[in-house]
């Protein structure tokens, strides 16, 4: 069997290292197969490179058959027997939520031993009220996402260089290891088609291999992180796998569209999408909401709420959902052409999240700003569009930004536009330049 290559992801690794040797428990969350386990290995490798010895590192992957089934007490005793005396021990627990009562054991490690703790989980249930009760104020969450476009190029063996352009700014050049030059847009199209799941760098970008790999991700998320998790919780909110699949397909097909549980139920009935299942009537709004929450807790979909820019408050209705990896969307719906505007919007949304922004939809009067991105004292208003070449498109994208009276940055990110320019104080930049910053 070919050994998986451990590739650097400095964006996340540096965030983890920043909390090394603090009492904060480092919690890495994100959809299954997005690279959390590799980050744990990279962190352990970093420790060894900086003088930490092997006996100071305990690594446990609870999805491995090599780790025996255990409850919280067995977990505690297993680790206690391996703690390094008179030196700090570094504890790495992968998919720790598989241990019933794990939070009791982890809290005891923190109290009883000189240790530095790192854990991962593929479901937001990991950070539920139970964890908050035991570890309130003592953990930091590192939210891990699939590869950015820049990481995608790196993982697939492409080299990005920049040189000054005679027309101003910088021109980006992408080559492979042999020096052959590739078109940036062509590679972006591959990213927008196949997505950024890290394992694709090992299996390649042939359509059959990609489909098989993404099928494995999807099945693992639905079975392990939704259906099985419901059993572990002792709750049975998610009882209809057919309905779950229909809701997944609806959300995937409607990324970037205003969505509610009511509208989903109506669409399922009106378009006859329930005919192949056992359910004969429209599911209750609460049922659909429970299914959506399960999908967001498994990190396959992310909800984004609307913010009234003038009223300065969040609105309760008509939020949107984006899918964590555009390759998963194409796997679910078929590798079809079209809808590139929403695909670009989806990609930009997750790029803003990667860069540490909190993101909302902006509402101003009866118009919409795609994203309000905030981070500490920084704020920017972002419009996303395929092209800024047509006058009517330019006016549509600029109009809501012109209405905003504060002095925060306002930008339009377009797949097709001239060199970076400014109009009415609004910066217009090319999407590929933004993604490769």
Protein language model annotation of sequence segments:
Residues 3-21:
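Pre-Walker A adenine-sensing motif
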Residues 2-5, 23, 29, 38, ...:
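A cross-kingdom feature that marks ATP-driven nucleic-acid transaction machinery
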Residues 58-87:
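Short glycine-rich substrate-engagement loop in P-loop NTPases that contacts/grips substrate
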Residues 6, 159-344, 350, 358:
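Interdomain hinge/linker elements that couple catalytic modules in large macromolecular machines
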Residues 84-102:
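Conserved P-loop NTPase "ATPase switch" module shared by AAA+ and STAND
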């Amino acid at each position: 069997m070919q050994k998986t290559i451990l590739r650097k992801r400095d964006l996340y690794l540096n965030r983890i290292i920043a909390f090394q040797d603090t009492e904060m428990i480092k919690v890495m969350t994100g959809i299954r197969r997005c690279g959390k386990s590799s980050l744990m290995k990279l962190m352990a490798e970093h420790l060894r490179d900086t003088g930490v010895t092997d006996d100071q590192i305990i690594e446990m992957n609870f999805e491995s058959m090599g780790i025996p089934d255990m409850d919280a007490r067995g977990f505690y005793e297993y680790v206690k027997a391996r703690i390094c005396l008179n030196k700090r021990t570094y504890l790495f627990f992968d998919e720790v939520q598989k241990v019933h009562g794990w939070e009791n054991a982890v809290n005891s490690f923190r109290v009883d031993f000189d240790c530095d703790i790192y854990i991962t989980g593929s479901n937001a249930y990991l950070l539920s009220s139970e964890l908050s009760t035991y570890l309130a104020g003592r953990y930091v969450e590192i939210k891990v996402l699939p590869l950015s476009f820049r990481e995608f190029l790196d993982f697939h063996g492409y080299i990005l260089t920049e040189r000054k352009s005679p027309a101003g700014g910088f021109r980006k050049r992408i080559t492979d290891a042999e020096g052959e030059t590739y078109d940036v847009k062509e590679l972006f199209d591959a990213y927008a088609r196949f997505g950024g799941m890290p394992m694709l760098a090992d299996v390649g970008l042939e359509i059959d291999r990609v489909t098989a790999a993404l099928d494995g991700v999807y099945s693992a998320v639905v079975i392990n992180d939704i259906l099985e998790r419901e059993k572990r919780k002792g709750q049975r909110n998610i009882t209809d796998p057919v309905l779950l699949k229909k809701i997944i397909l609806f959300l995937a097909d409607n990324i970037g569209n205003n969505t509610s549980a009511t509208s989903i139920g109506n669409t399922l009935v009106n378009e006859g999408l329930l005919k192949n299942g056992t359910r004969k009537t429209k599911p209750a709004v609460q049922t659909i909401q429970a299914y959506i929450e399960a999908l967001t807790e498994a990190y396959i979909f992310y909800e984004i709420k609307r913010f009234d820019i003038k009223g300065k408050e969040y609105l309760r209705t008509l939020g949107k959902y984006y899918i964590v990896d555009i390759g998963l969307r194409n796997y679910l719906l078929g590798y079809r052409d079209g809808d590139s505007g929403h695909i670009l919007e989806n990609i930009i949304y997750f790029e803003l999240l990667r860069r540490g922004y909190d993101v909302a939809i902006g509402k101003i009067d009866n118009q919409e700003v795609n994203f309000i991105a905030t981070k500490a004292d920084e704020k920017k208003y972002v419009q996303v569009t395929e092209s800024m070449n047509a006058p009517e498109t330019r006016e549509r994208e600029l109009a809501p930004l012109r209405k905003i009276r504060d002095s925060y940055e306002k930008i339009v990110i377009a797949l097709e536009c001239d060199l970076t320019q400014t109009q009415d104080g609004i910066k217009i930049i090319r999407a590929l330049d933004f993604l490769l910053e």
